[in-house]
């Protein structure tokens, strides 16, 4: 009995020793995994800078885009051409003629009106449709010309071409933006400031002479208006009488 008890007691530490070795192995694995995670978390990442432009480098025969990083100490390439941003671009680049760039200056808001710039004002071709004429008249005028001078140039060109109907140079004319515009342009307005190259010209309507002359056509216009009203009433009465006769004839035939 004592031997069996002693064997059991001796065998128990062996079993406990086996279990403790297993727990030590699992603990060692846990510690190693934890150390690996801490090492991966402590890895330093390189900082990336976002730059507006990409520099193209050639490595052998292949072309690829490469962005220089200041952290690596690579030298930055100097730009050969300066970058011009949109706010620095002047509005004169949208002018119709390159010679307009010389006319603009920061001290003058409307250089076309100045006397010093009128001699150097550029010329443009405008097309003017004349009332009653089949096609427009093309004339070359300066941007500094006003409406009155433009009308004279167009009338002279119209008469030289021999168009019909013939125009009297002494008569007054009006210049409009288009055929559908009611209000005419003022004679002092500058062609360069209007922003249009096509116009419509027609004869100016005659003005009434005086107060007495204006009253007489008003009275004469009342007379035909009263006659028209009476004629309309007579036509209505005649239609009613005709229809009543037709209805009467139909009733007689039915009976």
Curated annotation (Swiss-Prot):
Biased composition (Basic residues): 1-10
InterPro entries linked: At4g22758-like, DUF7054
Start-end of Basic and acidic residues biased regions: 44-61
Renumbered residue ranges of the record's region Disordered: 1-78
Pfam families: DUF7054 (PF23156)
Protein name: Uncharacterized protein At4g22758
Species of origin: Arabidopsis thaliana (Mouse-ear cress)
Lineage: Eukaryota, Viridiplantae, Streptophyta, Embryophyta, Tracheophyta
């Amino acid at each position: 009995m004592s031997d069996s008890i002693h064997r059991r007691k001796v065998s128990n530490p062996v079993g406990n020793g086996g279990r403790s070795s297993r727990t030590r192995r699992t603990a060692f694995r846990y510690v190693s995994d934890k150390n690996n995670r801490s090492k991966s978390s402590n890895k330093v990442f390189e900082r990336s800078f976002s730059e507006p432009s990409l520099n193209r480098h050639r490595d052998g025969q292949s072309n690829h885009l490469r962005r220089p990083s200041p952290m690596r100490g690579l030298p930055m390439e100097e730009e050969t051409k300066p970058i011009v941003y949109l706010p620095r671009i002047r509005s004169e680049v949208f002018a119709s003629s390159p010679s307009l760039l010389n006319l603009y200056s920061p001290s003058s808001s409307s250089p076309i009106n100045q006397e010093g710039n009128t001699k150097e004002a550029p010329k443009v071709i405008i097309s003017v449709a004349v009332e009653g004429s089949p096609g427009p008249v093309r004339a070359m005028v300066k941007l500094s010309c006003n409406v009155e001078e433009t009308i004279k140039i167009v009338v002279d060109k119209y008469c030289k071409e021999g168009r019909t109907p013939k125009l009297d140079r002494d008569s007054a004319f009006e210049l409009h933006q288009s055929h559908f515009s009611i209000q005419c342009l003022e004679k002092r307005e500058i062609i360069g400031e209007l922003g249009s190259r096509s116009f419509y010209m027609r004869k100016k309507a005659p003005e009434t002479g005086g107060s007495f002359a204006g009253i007489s056509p008003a009275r004469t216009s009342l007379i035909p208006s009263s006659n028209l009203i009476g004629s309309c009433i007579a036509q209505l009465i005649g239609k009613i009488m005709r229809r009543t006769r037709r209805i009467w004839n139909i009733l007689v035939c039915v009976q």
